[in-house]
Amino acid sequence: MTDAPFDRADIDALLDARHPDPFACLGPHRVGDATVVRTLLPGALRVRAIAAGGGVLGELRQVDPAGCFAGALPDGRERGERPRYRLSIDWPDARQDVEDAYAFGTLLDEDALARFAAGDPRAALACLGARALDMDGVPGVRFAVWAPGASRVSVVGDFNGWDARRHPMRLRRPWGVWELFVPRIGAGERYKFALRARDGAALPLKADPCACRTEAPPRTASIVADLDALERFGWHDDAWLRARASLDLAHAPVSIYEVHPESWLRVAAEGNRSATWDELAQRLIPYAAGMGFSHVELTPIAEYPFGGSWGYQSLSPFAPSARFGPPEGFARFVEHAHAAGLGVIVDWVPAHFPDDPHGLGKFDGTALFEHADPREGWHPDWHTHVFNVGRREVGAFLIASALAWAHRYHVDGIRVDAVASMLYRDYSRAAGEWVPNVYGGRENLESIAFLKHFNDTLHGPAAPPGVATFAEESTAWPGVTAPTAEHGLGFDFKWNMGWMHDTLAYLREDPIHRRHHHDRLTFGLVYAFSERFVLPLSHDEVVHGKGSLAAKMPGDAWQRLANLRAYFGFMWAHPGKKLLFMGGEFAQWGEFAHDATPQWDLLDAPAHRGVQRLVRDLNRLHAAEPALHALDDRPAGFAWLVGDDRNNSVFAFVRRDDAGRMLVAVCNFTPVPRTDYRLGLPAPGRWAEVLNTDGAAYGGTDAGNGGALQADEIPAHGERWSAALRLPPLATLWLRPA
């Protein structure tokens, strides 16, 4: 080999890890009639260029003792052809033969990059992150990261000793995306990005925002995921997916078991660690299916650094948390769920993200993912950054993560957290602490557009058919579940937070005072059909001093459980889909604690087993009775029979389906049994008592009507027929024409 020039300024910039364009000097370059190869390999003793067969093409001379080598290849190729060579590197303890990362051309398609910049989530999914693949027949990993404000980005990891000088990346300047193909590494490699801000200042090492796998906290590196293995995963849920695509979920029975997977099951013999996905598949799935739930909903499982956030402060929205094992484990979990007849819903948090130094905040030295103005970009309640969803690339990044959960893991639903905080610019902000929109209003127009884009994408051809979207939205914002074509947000369902707050406030009252709060239980029907609702008894209501569901109830232990059973009977008969957080199904006394399991030992007590049995029976009856779900979102599916008996705290209503089938629910929310309570009924003859929450099997007194009653032609409550009922104390009855 002949000598080859290596500019001193380039050498200094490379050694300082501040060169803005490493491909301009590293790798093969045509200089006159020769091909010059330059490489930066700090710590290398000797470097030679070798042919594919192993023959030595020549020596690269060390031009700087810090690790800069250069030399000219013998000219034996056509002009314009990429030179074929490998580097044979002598390290102090080993020899390595590897392709030159700087001998490869551009990696990402310009059209895909342009679509990403325009806000296309499919392009974000295709372009960004780490992908093990072959380039020109060479195996390796393609890295790509969006960081338009950085002056230099390197990928670092175990494969280069975490040395930012070794693998500086190429900037695709119009789009702000940095890329590099690193040969001869693969899935399982740990890595991060080393960035310099525009002023040259070194930033903390950053995890990959689009990493599909991470280290388990408290470690923070990204890991190259085996996406090929995920894409080749042996799914056997084709029948489930076909049925899901044709299912009208709004008019189907939906009962959701909300689970914090980190604490639902812990392994005490191994330091109280969380269960793996495979362990949860063996325990949680048969339990939830056996309880009659239609879905499990998981609090956020995208990797999150702080366990005390319960997952709601995620930094890696594409990566299932390593707390539970590798990504393939989550795929197996979903596969098991579908085989058992359970859908899987995941919580998703596009509103905000935490301030951890390895995360998204000031990612490239600028406010990249967040707003620059703290009045828009900092959340005062949670002390987190607010995503700038109005920036096209940020919106594409977030929606791409939702698509990834749907495509890679076959999830059946995505529940969007904290929607209200996104919709209002003054959410939790005092006057002067927020920025009005362009019209001077408080509505966040960018978030509205983002949420519509999210729903249109998840309901469009880019996503698998039948994926449902849920909004945790706590205000009276109109049209949350209206189609985007009708100026709605486009969600399938909205959590009915108002119903939850009102009904729990009623149940907290001593029964003697409930007559003064009667409207709290009836008010929900004023707006019950304005949206498609989920009735949520979620984790948020059993934490931070609010008390568990059972602990909220007044009275002694028996009365508390009786109140809760009656409430469950009322809730499962009420219009709206059902959601119950873990522990509530057996009336645990303690609040949710993220570092402890539910109080499973309470199931040794018959009273708590009785509540559990009731929830199971409610789920099964709810699924079997079309009147209880077929018209959940339509006024024709509900009518009050007794809505004004505040003196007795008695409520009664009828549920119907569009075929005329009906079921009547009657609730007595006092501890006083009511004998000969005449109730108007919509049909004559024999009525079966299909459910009594005071049944002995549920821990009650077994008072009731002996399983049946007769409706005679005696007018009452606006109906032609009526029956004299015995109403058990603190109980709900379900009646159906026999």
UniProtKB/Swiss-Prot annotation:
Its EC number is 2.4.1.18. GO terms for molecular function: 1,4-alpha-glucan branching enzyme activity; cation binding; hydrolase activity, hydrolyzing O-glycosyl compounds. One of its GO terms (cellular component) is cytosol. Pathway: Glycan biosynthesis; glycogen biosynthesis. The active site is at 417 (nucleophile), 472 (proton donor). Belongs to the glycosyl hydrolase 13 family. GlgB subfamily. This is 1,4-alpha-glucan branching enzyme GlgB. It comes from Burkholderia pseudomallei (strain 1106a).
